[in-house]
Amino acid sequence: MVSLVATVAYLGLEARAVEVQCQVAPGMPGFHLVGLPDKAVGESRQRVNAALTSMGLALPPKRITINLSPADLPKEGSHYDLPIALSLLSAMGVVDAEQLADFVAVGELALDGRVIPSPGVLLAALHASETEKGLICPAAQGSEASWVSGGSNGVPVLAAPDLVSLLNHLKGTQVLRPPEPGRADPVPRGPDLRQVKGQETAKRALEIAAAGSHNLLMAGPPGAGKSLLASCLPGILPELTAAEALEVSIVASVAGTLEDGRISRARPYRAPHHSASIAALTGGGLKVRPGEISMAHLGVLFLDELPEFQRAVLDSLRQPLETGEVTVARANAHVTFPARVQNQMHVCKILTHLSYGIFYDHYHRKNGDLLWTILDQRAVQRLFLRTSENAGT
């Protein structure tokens, strides 16, 4: 008999369906995991074994085979621990397979059986909702999952603190309380543009850039107030709508930076250092993660000392500014992240992915031809600050 449990694989901001298949058959005792697992997934054998031992369960002295299907899709991350454990428990007859058929399971297991958070739960909840299934996830991320899978659509969310509580709930001896969607964080108060004295021309340009979602080039001598004005931009942008907040939170969830499942209505503000690499700015790495331009989705990306960025890094901005997407190509996958610059006030055609103004600071002749090529991709407000306007700041 083969037991089946549904889970997901993350490819950028896309969740692919994965089926965890478990077979317990006579033969030489062993625990075999196949289906292109990475090192983190391969180590789940030890975590699952230790978690079951903490529950007082022992693996049967048989040949255990776990297959992550489809086998040609790379599997990365520790969120496979929980579905692997549930599939194994189903094959051992501890839990009824029919009770797991309508759920997607994600979560990492601690050695004592606790279900601990893993990145991407919000994306898994979206996938579960689209496939009309419930979601089994860590208790610490239940409020995060409830933004999508709970509430009016009736899709259940089982937020389990540990494996024992989850099994007791499935057996009917314990009831896991449905999690409530986490309250949206209040918009934090940053620098107030009204408190900046002088620089009326600069402040007017800032307002125009915010209203029209224009890129803005700020050039001037040190101490002119360019960085201060740039930090004031999020304060004059409107709050994120519920749909926009969900989009921003999905990116944060995949990156593992969403705190306590709380959806934020504040516009993201990212200010990478000029030594940032291409992978840091556009996304990449061994396990592809969103870069700074995607983390600024629907928000502000402030590039201070722009000419000090490496030429190759600046060149990597051309396509995102033109197409509104960042595609990271790897040998085993092509991952696309959002990087759209678009007016939230509907001046232009509304697209799915938006990002408010990109700031360029301290422009000069270094890499000039390349910089102007980048800037000409979109309407740009070019502002030259004069120190004479700084009196009283």
Model-identified regions with their sequence ranges:
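Peripheral, non-AAA+ core regions of ATP-driven protein-machinery
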Residues: 1-228, 310, 322, 327-330
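P-loop NTPase nucleotide-binding/switch module
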Residues: 174-208, 212, 243-294
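Walker A/P-loop
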Residues: 218-257
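The Walker A (P-loop) glycine that initiates the GxxxxGKT/S ATP-binding motif of P-loop NTPases
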Residues: 220, 283, 305
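AAA+/SF3 P-loop NTPase mechanochemical coupling elements
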Residues: 269-272, 289-298, 329-346
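Substrate-gripping "pore-loop 1 plus following alpha2 helix"
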Residues: 287, 315-337, 355, 365
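Conserved AAA+/SF3 P-loop NTPase catalytic/coupling segment centered on the Walker-B
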Residues: 290-321
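N-terminal low-complexity segments that are often proline-rich with Ser/Thr-Pro
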Residues: 345-393
